[in-house]
């Protein structure tokens, strides 16, 4: 067997830098070394510098205790003899088509969706109209740009207020709930918009949906799409929603995998997951997040083309419940990337 060299790419310039590093730690520890030779390429957050990182101790630490890319040997991807890239980059400058485009130009296969699907999935203001046009329900809302906010603050506030409270204000292109605020009344709205605009020049303002937070994964295996079991996220304690702290810092989240929903509801979620995946033209993998309301309505929240990928992240846990180990999922994704390069016209 010819061992394939896999570049695990992590870090990056987004606000999800640390989460990317945690995902890379997980993959590095679990990748099947009888099939693959891993190397780690870290992208420093402050300046976007690329480094080849030590396999034994690749990361430094931030003040919050989470890992980060600090230093390493300067690297040129073209000289490494890489067979496939595993871009474990979450958020802008990685999950949004930028790294995918670079790999396309260099003719290197990579795990996950292509340039267009990655870019559209990252920008909720583009993804949601596509979901709606394909028969998926989305929350009522509006898009607000930085220019609109600066030029006519009063009109923007009026439009948002007309939606009714509570609202969620979030960056159009961000993840891990960074920059997201639940707004209960009008006097909280301006600060929430300013916070979201500090993460992205475009903001999504949506009516808060009351419902259970439901998630489902997709894996592409030999060109065929498969859905995982359906899971539910339950946020405990004082958190208003599934925010960054609840996800990664204070352990106030529990998961029901599989979710305690009816078989017919599970089938509905799995069908909607495939529909969302295909609507955007995704490839390889995704995690699709929904709200299931008390009357049985299913509302799509977002699709993640490179979901959190630690052993304890939702995506691997959904597949573990279906009998696929973390190591097996990693192998499937790498092999699918190589398969697509041979059989899919770009």
What are these model-predicted stretches?
Residues 1-116, 120-122, 126, 144-158, ...:
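ATP-binding N-terminal substructure of ATP-dependent carboxylate-amine bond-forming enzymes
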Residues 2-10, 14, 22, 79, ...:
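Active-site nucleotide/adenylate-binding loops and adjacent lid/helix of ATP-dependent enzymes
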Residues 2-4, 9, 260-346:
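ATP-dependent carboxylate activation and anion-phosphoryl transfer catalytic cores
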Residues 38, 109-110, 138, 167, ...:
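Hydrophobic beta-strand scaffold residues
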Residues 54-58, 101, 241-249, 305:
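Short, flexible, mixed-charge acidic loops at enzyme active sites
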Residues 101-110, 185-190, 321-322:
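A glycine- and small-aliphatic-rich helix-loop capping segment at beta-alpha/alpha-beta transitions
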Residues 184-271, 292, 297-299:
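Phosphate-binding site of ATP-dependent enzymes
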């Amino acid at each position: 067997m010819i061992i394939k060299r896999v570049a695990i790419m992590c870090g990056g310039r987004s606000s999800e830098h640390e989460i990317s590093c945690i995902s890379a730690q997980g993959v590095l520890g679990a990748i099947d070394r009888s099939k693959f030779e891993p190397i780690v390429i870290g992208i420093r957050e402050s300046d976007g510098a690329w480094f080849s990182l030590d396999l034994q101790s690749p990361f430094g630490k931030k003040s919050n205790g989470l890992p980060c890319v600090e230093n390493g040997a300067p690297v040129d991807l073209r000289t490494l003899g890489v067979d496939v890239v595993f871009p474990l980059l979450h958020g802008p400058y990685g999950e949004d088509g930028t790294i995918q485009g670079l790999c396309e130009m260099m003719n290197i296969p990579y795990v996950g969706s292509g340039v267009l699907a990655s870019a559209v999935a990252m920008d909720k203001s583009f993804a949601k109209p596509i979901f709606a046009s394909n028969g998926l329900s989305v929350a009522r809302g509006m898009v607000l740009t930085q220019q609109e906010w600066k030029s006519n603050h009063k009109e923007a506030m009026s439009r948002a207020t007309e939606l009714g409270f509570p609202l969620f204000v979030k960056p159009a292109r961000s993840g891990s709930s960074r920059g997201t605020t639940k707004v209960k009344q009008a006097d909280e709205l301006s600060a929430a918009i300013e916070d979201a605009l500090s993460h992205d020049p475009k903001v999504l303002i949506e009516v808060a949906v009351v419902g259970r937070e439901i998630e489902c994964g997709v894996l592409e295996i030999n060109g065929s799409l498969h859905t995982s079991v359906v899971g539910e996220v339950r946020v405990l304690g004082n958190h208003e929603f599934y925010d960054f702290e609840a996800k990664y810092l204070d352990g106030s989240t529990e998961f029901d995998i599989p979710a305690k929903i009816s078989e017919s509801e599970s089938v509905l979620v799995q069908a909607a997951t495939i529909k969302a995946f295909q609507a955007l033209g995704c490839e390889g993998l995704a995690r699709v997040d929904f709200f299931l309301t008390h009357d049985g309505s299913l509302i799509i929240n977002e699709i993640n083309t490179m979901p959190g990928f630690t052993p304890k992240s939702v995506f691997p846990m959904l597949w573990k419940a279906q009998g696929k180990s973390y190591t097996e999922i990693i192998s499937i994704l790498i092999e699918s990337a190589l398969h697509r390069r041979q059989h899919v016209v770009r």
